[in-house]
Structure formats: C-alpha cells, structure tokens
A protein has these predicted regions:
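Alpha-helical membrane-anchoring segments
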Residues: 1-458
C-alpha cells in the first residue's frame, strides 16, 4: 500500500503542460461572464433573486443572509468582473475566490432556481482557487513567466468534469428513463422543427433519445480519455450538447460550458499539438520540450504533501457521496426530493403539482385555505408545489402571514397533488400533518407519502 501511495504521489507530481487548464479557465470565465450579463440583461436578477419578498431556501442553508436588492445586483456585477479576470488570468486565484464567494452566495439565496450547471460552476470555481489555472495564456503568466503544472492538478479537474457525465449516466438507469420518460412528454412539443419534427412525437424517438443519452453519459469520458476514439467522441459530444440545446433551450449555458471544459480530458498539451498540426507553431517533441516548472517542486515538503492529499481525497469523496446520498433515503428520490439536488439528475423529471394550505386556528378550530400564490412569485410557486421540503417551508410562511392577529400558533396542513413523469396526480404529503409544527430533519421526512405507482420496469 505504501508503495502504491508513493507511485501515485510521484505520478501526480510529474510536470505536464498547463495548456489544457488554460483552455478550461478561459472557457469557464467566458461562460461565467456571459451568464452574469444574461441575468442582468433579461431582468432575472430582479425577478428571480432580488424581487421575491420571501425566499425558499436550501435545507440547512437558512443561515445564509439575504441581502437587500441593490446588494444582489452588485453581487452579480462582481460575478461578471471576477469571471472576466478569471478568463484572462489576472490574479486568477483572488478572482476565482471572489467569483466563488459571490456566485455561491447568490445561488444559495433561492432554491427554486437550482440548475445543475450552477452547481457545476460552484464546484469548478472552488477548484480554480487552488489549482494552477493561470500557468499558461494568462496575464499572470506574462508577468511571472509560463510554467508547467503537476499532473494531479489536471486529473482533479478531469474528475470534476467526468463526475458530471458519469453520475448523470447512472441516474438515467431507471425504469422511467429507459421507457422514454420524461422525453416522451417533451419531444412532441418540438414537432414544429423542420425535417425531424414529425418524428419527435413518436415513442420510438423518445426511446432512442433516452437510451442514446444514457449510453452517451456512461461512456463518453472513457472515449475522450482514449486517444484512438477521442476525436470521434468529441464530435459526438459537441453534436449531443448542441442538439440538446436546440431541442430544450431552457437548459441555458450548460452545453456551452461542457463542450470546452470536456477538452481537459485530452492530453494536457493538446492545444500545442493542434497548432503544430495546423502549422501555426514549430513542433516541439515531448522528449526535448524544455521544462518550465518552478524550481524545487520535486522536493515538496512532506507535511504539505499530506495536507494536499487529504484535502483532495475529501473533496473527491464529497462529490461521490452527494450524488449517491439518495440511497440513504427510503422511496423514490425523484418523488420525495430527498437527495435529488446536487446529484446530477439531469433532465430526469417532469413534475406538475397543485397545493392548497388548510389553516386552522387552534382556539376555535376554525379553518380556511390559502394557496400561497400571493406570497411567492409564479416561478417560486411552480417549483414549491412539487417539492415536499419547500412545501414545508411555505407552510411556515403561510402560518406567519395568516397569524398576525392570532394569539396562538396556527396549524397548517397541505393538500398537495403531484404528477411525476406523466403519472396520475397523487398526494405528495400526509394531509393530516401540521407542517407549521414540523422542523427540517436531516433524515427522511415521515410526512412525505410514497410514490403511488411502482417504478416503471426496466
């Protein structure tokens, strides 16, 4: 075991080109900048982040302060400026840290705007604070000179990218997806597309797209790492992401982030190899390529090495545990929502719901209803009405809104009917439980009812 550790440490300390990290940094910064500009240009900062009077929060994240609206707008400007600095490699660690803090703060304000690519940007932003992303093609490298990077840095970013595809692929191995759902509900809406539109409404199209998507996610990382299949695999990847964006524009910048970020799975010096093949720079053979690594890297202090290794292992373990944590909960996590977010469950769910809250005054047992539509924005209400934890939070807010003149805590129960992937609507929550008295629990919520139908057979 000690010998294996030593060999792994030696391989991770080996100097490699920092060009693939530079491409990833430039792409990440560009997409981060474009995302911030898009949020501001479309008015989403006001409507989704600064505008709502009440926010629905991620579990255990209620301690994150909700700043005034003007501060939220300022944070998005900071995100844009920090992303631009990351893109050009200007004090990249400070810029990445600023981006990560501002972006994560904004992301944690509102659970109903959760997107997988926001979570991916949070993780990559944190990684870029510590990885040597500006060793090449950056303002920093112009000031201090270009340098190579440890191979471990490249592999850590590779893991970051690979985990998205691998866990997204594993998540697709369920009965609904392999039977063409929810794609079978979405694709007919694109029947207006030329040439292929008439085919999209068929069950065969939904099955082919579902099985093809699962196969792609489960295998593309291996094919990108293998030189013999790399070019074909990347062409397939580009085609897959562009096609997905054309069919479902709501996925936003995710394809434009993953297409360039996936190139980190190529050889670390792939940009130079491409330029050499195009005749845009003289060939430099690997055995004669001069080393530009900072002096003394080979004599890294043992204590520092152990700290770095432990931190990397914990970081990787966290990102393996989060997508798999739903296994610790009973029932179907797509229905209960427990362990769903931060797990790369990409395009797996079509939920529609309706919820009405029954409020009871314990003093005289008088009861009335409130659908909470005046408390939350349409976007918040739509997501909340299908999510048990957010319904619980809404019940607490409904109690506050209706209990201003009451001397006793009001009881709030929910009639929540939800449809999952085309199933008949069914009760999501026990209608007899007073949600206003229910705290958040780390474990399973006992008042969430099981999915009424058995999962569709594989």
């Amino acid at each position: 075991m000690a010998d294996l550790y030593t060999r792994a440490l030696s391989a991770g300390s080996r100097d490699v080109s920092g060009e693939s990290l530079a491409v990833a940094r430039i792409a990440f910064g560009a997409v981060g900048l474009a995302s911030a500009i898009r949020l501001m240009a479309r008015g989403w900062v006001s409507s989704l982040l600064a505008g709502p009077e009440h926010h629905l929060r991620y579990p255990a994240m209620g301690w994150v302060p909700v700043p005034p609206g003007w501060v939220v707008h300022l944070l998005v400007v900071v995100i844009a400026l920090a992303a631009a600095c990351v893109m050009v490699g200007f004090h990249h660690r400070a810029a990445a840290a600023t981006f990560w803090i501002a972006f994560t703060w904004v992301e944690l304000l509102e659970a109903t705007i959760y997107l997988n690519h926001y979570w991916f940007m949070t993780l990559v932003g944190a990684s870029m604070v510590v990885l040597p992303m500006s060793a090449r093609w950056s303002v920093d490298s112009v000031r201090r000179g270009p340098s190579d990077v440890p191979a471990a840095a490249v592999w850590l970013l590779r893991f970051q990218v690979a985990s998205v595809y691998l866990f997204a692929g594993l998540a697709k191995l369920n009965g609904d997806w392999l039977n063409g759902l929810p794609l079978g509900l979405w694709l007919p809406a694109r029947s207006d597309l030329p040439i292929i539109g008439s085919l999209l409404g068929t069950h065969t199209a939904a099955l082919l797209a579902s099985w093809g998507g699962a196969l792609f996610d489960c295998t593309v990382v291996g094919f990108l790492l293998w030189r013999r299949t790399r070019i074909v695999a990347w062409i397939v990847l580009v085609t897959f992401h562009v096609s997905t964006w054309l069919l479902f524009p709501v996925i936003g910048v995710f394809p434009w982030l993953m297409i360039p970020m996936s190139t980190v799975l190529f050889d670390p010096d792939w940009p130079s190899r491409v330029l050499e093949r195009l005749g845009l720079r003289p060939a430099v053979h690997p055995q004669t390529r001069p080393s530009t690594a900072p002096a003394g890297r080979s004599a890294v202090r043992p204590l520092r090495t152990r700290v770095v290794v432990v931190a990397a292992v914990l970081w990787i373990a966290l990102q393996i545990a989060l997508p798999l944590r739903h296994l610790a909960y009973p029932g179907d996590h797509r229905w209960t929502g427990e362990g769903l977010r931060f797990g790369w469950n990409v395009m797996l769910i079509e939920k529609a719901g309706d919820v009405t809250f029954r409020i009871t005054d314990p003093r005289d047992r008088s009861t009335w209803t409130d659908d909470a539509r005046t408390i939350y924005t349409p976007q918040q209400w739509r997501v909340m009405s299908t999510d048990p934890e957010l319904i619980r939070q809404a019940a607490h807010q409904v109690a506050l809104e209706n209990g201003a003149t009451s001397t006793a805590p009001l009881e709030v129960r929910a009639d929540a009917l939800v449809s999952l992937n085309g199933r008949t609507s069914a009760r999501l929550i026990d209608p007899d439980v007073d949600l206003a008295a229910e705290p958040w629990r780390l474990g399973a919520q006992p008042w969430v009812l099981p999915v009424p139908e058995a999962p569709r057979p594989l």
